[in-house]
């Protein structure tokens, strides 16, 4: 598959070259906190599929950073360009995510993406790829481990253990809700390891997922709509 997308400039569509590109882009990931101490806007992104997988559906939710209430929601649809290949999720989903980002009326200060950050065999999951391409601070929130190993965290909400790969930490296993499997939390770009954990904890409510990706997941999976309060919708939509 050939692509003219500038996000994948020079990529010939092969798996081998995609992995090489990941290794190159991973060197551009920044693991220092660039998020304001008092951010105004957060965003959550998730991806689903329609038409038996032929259409990629990316959901974006913009939230107030203090109240975690949704301010606006958008869904972008693009033709699915490649099949699922383990470890190459961003090459399949990033075009739709960037389309959804462009629909937001304001730029978020911090982005949460359903998927891996640097907790990835080549340190470039979809949240890291998104962050490098956009320059936005990003955190990856994944439901399952893709790389590394960890000791099972304790049973209580907030219990966490480091995820290690080759002796280096690549993320956290976080018990976000009792009696639920831990989340895989990792920095994507312009967020530190500790910052990724702290921000995830700050955005948890009564659910397993933090609010930004929980709301985006509802839209992307078509399990429900996200209601924007009237006072907010008049301001931003």
Swiss-Prot record:
Gene (name only): nfi
The text of the family note is: Belongs to the endonuclease V family.
Name where it's found.
Cytoplasm
Keyword list (alphabetical) reads: Cytoplasm, DNA damage, DNA repair, Endonuclease, Hydrolase, Magnesium, Metal-binding, Nuclease
**Catalytic activity as recorded in UniProt:** Endonucleolytic cleavage at apurinic or apyrimidinic sites to products with a 5'-phosphate
Task: State where it is primarily located.
Answer: cytoplasm
Q: What class of enzyme is it?
A: hydrolase
For activity, the cofactor(s) needed are: Mg(2+)
User: Which residues does this entry assign to the site Interaction with target DNA?
Assistant: 84
What Enzyme Commission number(s) appear in the record?
3.1.21.7
Which BP terms from GO are recorded? DNA repair
GO CC, one annotated term: cytoplasm
One Pfam annotation reads Endonuclease_5
Whether DNA damage counts among this entry's keywords is: yes
State what protein this is by name: Endonuclease V
Q: Where does Mg(2+) bind?
A: 46, 114
Biological function: DNA repair enzyme involved in the repair of deaminated bases. Selectively cleaves double-stranded DNA at the second phosphodiester bond 3' to a deoxyinosine leaving behind the intact lesion on the nicked DNA.
* Superkingdom of origin: Bacteria
**GO MF annotation: an example:** deoxyribonuclease V activity
């Amino acid at each position: 598959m050939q692509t003219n997308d500038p996000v994948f400039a020079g990529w010939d569509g092969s798996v081998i070259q995609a992995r090489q590109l990941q290794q190159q882009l991973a060197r551009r990931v920044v693991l220092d906190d660039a998020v304001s101490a008092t951010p105004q806007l957060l965003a959550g992104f998730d991806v689903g599929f329609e038409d038996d997988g032929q259409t990629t559906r990316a959901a974006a939710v913009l939230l107030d950073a203090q109240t975690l209430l949704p301010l606006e929601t958008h869904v972008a649809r693009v033709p699915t360009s490649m099949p699922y290949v383990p470890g190459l999720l961003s090459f399949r989903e990033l075009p739709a995510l960037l389309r959804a980002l462009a629909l937001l009326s304001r730029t978020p200060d911090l982005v949460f993406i359903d998927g891996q950050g640097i907790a990835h065999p080549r340190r470039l999951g979809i949240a890291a790829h998104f962050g490098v391409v956009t320059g936005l601070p990003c955190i990856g929130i994944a439901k399952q481990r893709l790389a590394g190993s960890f000791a099972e965290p304790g049973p209580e909400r907030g219990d966490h253990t480091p995820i290690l790969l080759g002796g280096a930490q690549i993320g956290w296993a976080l018990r976000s809700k009792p009696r639920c499997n831990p989340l895989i939390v990792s920095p994507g770009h312009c967020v530190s390891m500790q910052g990724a954990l702290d921000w995830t904890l700050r955005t948890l409510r009564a659910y397993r997922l933090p609010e930004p990706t929980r709301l985006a997941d509802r839209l992307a999976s078509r399990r429900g709509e996200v209601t924007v309060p009237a006072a907010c919708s008049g301001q931003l939509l």
